[in-house]
């Protein structure tokens, strides 16, 4: 049964829905994360594939979101890391990321999540969806990106499986954002389907907040 929020004192909750690569894949990504001076590299706690950024909502809407995602039914996804690239902002490199393939199964899951969120009043996603894992955030003081892209252009991992979806709360701080898992939603297995009802994390688990700063 979906548990309510744990009662943190925040009046609003900054939420997003994501897939978390398994530890061996995260380790491989971290090993490649170097070579751009001034980059804000992600740490292990921050590596994820965002399915849907929700943004700031009040407590009641947050509880509605957590409950709505309990209706998610979707298959597990076999995926792999395939190459690196970047996003630009105002003509400057803004973010370095690793691609995830095949894209369509992840995009299909993104659409299902979006449909469930619309049922509880979250606006439909209008931005194009590109499955990726953010590796670093850049600013005007960051060094050249081209050497990193050239070195890691063929970055690849063995196939792995996304077995569940997680609802996260993002807490902004002076050192950057910290991501707290709120509820986990298993995806259906490839043979015997498992229940997609949410398994909310206990208050104790949530209170053991990871130390992370993007």
Would you name each region that the model predicts?
Residues 2-204, 214:
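Histidine-dependent nucleotide/RNA phosphoesterase domain, centered on the 2H-phosphoesterase fold
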């Amino acid at each position: 049964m979906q548990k309510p929020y744990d009662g943190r004192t925040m009046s609003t909750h900054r939420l997003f829905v994501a897939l978390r690569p398994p530890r061996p894949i995260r380790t491989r990504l971290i090993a490649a994360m170097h070579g751009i001076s001034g980059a804000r590299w992600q740490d292990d706690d921050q590596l994820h594939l965002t399915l849907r950024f929700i943004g700031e909502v009040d407590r009641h809407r947050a509880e509605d979101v957590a409950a709505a995602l309990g209706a998610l039914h979707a298959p597990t996804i076999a995926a792999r890391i395939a190459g690196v690239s970047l996003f630009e902002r105002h003509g400057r490199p803004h973010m370095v990321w690793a691609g995830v393939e095949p894209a369509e199964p992840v995009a299909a899951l993104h659409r299902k999540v979006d449909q469930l969120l619309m049922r509880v009043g979250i606006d439909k996603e209008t931005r194009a969806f590109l499955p990726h894992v953010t590796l670093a955030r850049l600013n005007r003081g960051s060094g050249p990106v081209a050497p990193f892209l050239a070195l890691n252009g063929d970055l690849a991992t063995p196939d792995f499986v996304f077995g569940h979806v997680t609802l996260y709360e993002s807490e902004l701080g002076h050192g950057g954002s910290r991501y707290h898992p709120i509820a986990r939603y298993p995806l259906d297995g490839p043979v015997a389907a498992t229940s997609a009802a949410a398994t909310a994390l206990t208050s104790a688990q949530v209170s053991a907040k990871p130390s992370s700063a993007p």
